[in-house]
């Protein structure tokens, strides 16, 4: 009788333990499904997975607040030798920030636009100064905030599915997240062209442009990641060696590049002017179908954003990244107070009529005085690192 009682008791405890394990697993699964960002220690690396695939892994303030402290922790950890960042879902690395939420918060008098840009730029700077090898797998759409999470890192791996763009002038903003630093440092006037037109680079062109350091076929990304994770106490040179070997074996996207083979001379000559008006005049004088297409595109953009962007890149070409991010923070706060950003969000993301009514509507009406007001110091509210 006593023995049977013990067995029953053991059986009950076993059932409770089993139920507890199942419940814990379900909780973890639910957390994994709903967590916006996954932060995992795997092999020799810290792995960051942007986990909002239905929203193309759009970057939120909540995600930034999880990534930044973990990045700093892994940077200090002697057992973490590299950091990998990637996007879930196969369509996007990160398509940018939640621009609509920014506009709505500003109209409601909330501080999201101050907090998000400040903390995002501090994270961008931390990525640039990270003492551990940082590998961004930019497979799929990479725009805006996604560019900030990748382009400042030591290694950026593009695939045939990569799509890079900085389309902010079309919504009354400017190419931020350090765009004023990295864009003017691309070959020739390529960065100025990308910034003013929002032109989309695809596949191998993302590597040709210098946005990516390596190109790997997307079907090989998983094995590349596993090989990186399996490295024993790797140095930056060891990581580079693995990336180089996969880059050398890549077969996808070998077609010649129209943008680099046919249009770079035009881009360099037309976009070398010091004013947006003169860039447009250069394009008119060129008169080629490519040039005329760029005129059409530029004429749809916010005139204020175009002038801000050109000055941002010209000034950024001689500044440090921290100086650029400080400048860009000032610009974001001024744009939040202005008309064009909220009008751009309305036309592109809310009503989706694609016909924003810019104010001013003409380049000639955006004065130097207007422009200076965007670049002025915020005093005690300036960005601090």
Swiss-Prot record:
Swiss-Prot/TrEMBL GO biological process terms: valine catabolic process
Keyword annotations for this protein, in alphabetical order, are:
Acetylation, Branched-chain amino acid catabolism, Hydrolase, Mitochondrion, Phosphoprotein, Transit peptide
| InterPro entries referenced in this protein's UniProt entry, alphabetically | ClpP/crotonase-like_dom_sf, ECH_dom, HIBYL-CoA-H
**Key word Acetylation present in the record?**
yes
Main subcellular localization, coarse class? mitochondrion
pH-dependent activity: Optimum pH is 7-9 with 3-hydroxyisobutyryl-CoA as substrate and 6 with 3-hydroxypropionyl-CoA as substrate.
Q: Which GO terms describe its cellular component?
A: mitochondrion
Q: Which reaction does it catalyse?
A: 3-hydroxy-2-methylpropanoyl-CoA + H2O = 3-hydroxy-2-methylpropanoate + CoA + H(+)
E.C. code: 3.1.2.4
User: N6-acetyllysine: which positions carry it?
Assistant: 54, 91, 100, 220, 296, 352, 359, 364
Which positions are annotated as binding substrate? 120, 145, 168, 176
One Pfam family it belongs to: ECH_2
Organelle targeting sequence: 1-32
What is this protein's tissue specificity according to the annotation? Highest activity in liver, kidney and heart. Low activity in muscle and brain.
Q: Which residues carry this modification: N6-succinyllysine?
A: 54, 91, 100, 220, 249, 256, 296, 300, 352, 376
Q: Which residues carry this modification: Phosphoserine?
A: 233
Protein location? Mitochondrion
Under the heading CDD domains, the entry gives:
crotonase-like
The entry lists its GO molecular-function terms as: 3-hydroxyisobutyryl-CoA hydrolase activity
The pathway to which it is assigned is: Amino-acid degradation; L-valine degradation
Family the entry assigns: Belongs to the enoyl-CoA hydratase/isomerase family.
Query: What job does this protein perform?
Result: Hydrolyzes 3-hydroxyisobutyryl-CoA (HIBYL-CoA), a saline catabolite. Has high activity toward isobutyryl-CoA. Could be an isobutyryl-CoA dehydrogenase that functions in valine catabolism. Also hydrolyzes 3-hydroxypropanoyl-CoA.
Which NCBIfam families is this protein grouped with? Answer: PRK05617.1 (NF004127)
Note the PANTHER family from the entry.
3-HYDROXYISOBUTYRYL-COA HYDROLASE, MITOCHONDRIAL (PTHR43176:SF3), 3-HYDROXYISOBUTYRYL-COA HYDROLASE-RELATED (PTHR43176)
Provide the protein name.
3-hydroxyisobutyryl-CoA hydrolase, mitochondrial
* UniProt organism field: Rattus norvegicus
Tell me the lineage of the source organism. Answer: Eukaryota, Metazoa, Chordata, Craniata, Vertebrata
């Amino acid at each position: 009788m006593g023995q049977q009682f013990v067995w029953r008791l053991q059986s009950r405890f076993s059932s409770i333990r089993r139920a507890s394990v199942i419940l814990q697993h379900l909780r973890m699964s639910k957390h994994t499904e709903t967590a916006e960002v996954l932060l995992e220690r795997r092999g020799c690396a810290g792995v960051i997975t942007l986990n909002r695939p239905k929203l193309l892994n759009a970057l939120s303030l909540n995600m930034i607040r999880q990534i930044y402290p973990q990045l700093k922790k892994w940077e200090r950890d002697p057992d973490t030798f590299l950091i990998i960042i990637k996007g879930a879902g196969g369509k996007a690395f990160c398509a940018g920030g939640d621009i609509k939420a920014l506009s709505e918060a500003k109209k409601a008098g909330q501080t999201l636009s101050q907090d998000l840009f400040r903390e995002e730029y501090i994270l961008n700077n931390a990525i640039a100064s990270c003492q551990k090898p940082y590998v961004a797998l930019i497979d799929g759409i990479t725009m805006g905030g996604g560019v900030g999470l990748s382009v400042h890192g030591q290694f950026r791996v593009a695939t045939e599915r990569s799509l890079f763009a900085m389309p902010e002038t079309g919504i009354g903003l400017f190419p931020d997240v350090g765009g004023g630093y990295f864009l003017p440092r691309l070959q020739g006037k390529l960065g100025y062209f990308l910034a003013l037109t929002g032109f989309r680079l695809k596949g191998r062109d993302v590597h040709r442009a210098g946005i990516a350091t390596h190109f790997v076929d997307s079907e090989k990304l998983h094995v590349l990641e596993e090989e990186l994770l399996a490295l024993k106490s790797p140095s930056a040179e060891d990581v580079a060696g693995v990336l180089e070997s996969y880059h050398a074996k890549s077969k996808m996207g070998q077609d010649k590049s129209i943008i680099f083979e046919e249009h770079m001379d035009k881009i360099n000559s037309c976009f070398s002017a010091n004013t947006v008006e003169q860039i447009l005049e250069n394009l008119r004088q060129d008169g080629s179908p490519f040039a005329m297409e760029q005129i059409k595109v530029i004429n749809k953009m916010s005139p204020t954003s175009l002038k801000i962007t050109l000055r941002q890149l010209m000034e950024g070409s001689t500044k440090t990244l921290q100086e650029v991010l400080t400048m860009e923070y000032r610009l974001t706060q001024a744009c939040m107070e202005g008309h064009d950003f909220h009008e751009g969000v309305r036309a592109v993301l809310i009503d989706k009529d694609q016909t924003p009514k810019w104010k001013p509507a003409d380049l000639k009406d955006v004065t130097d005085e207007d422009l200076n007001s965007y670049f002025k110091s915020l005093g005690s509210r300036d960005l601090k690192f």
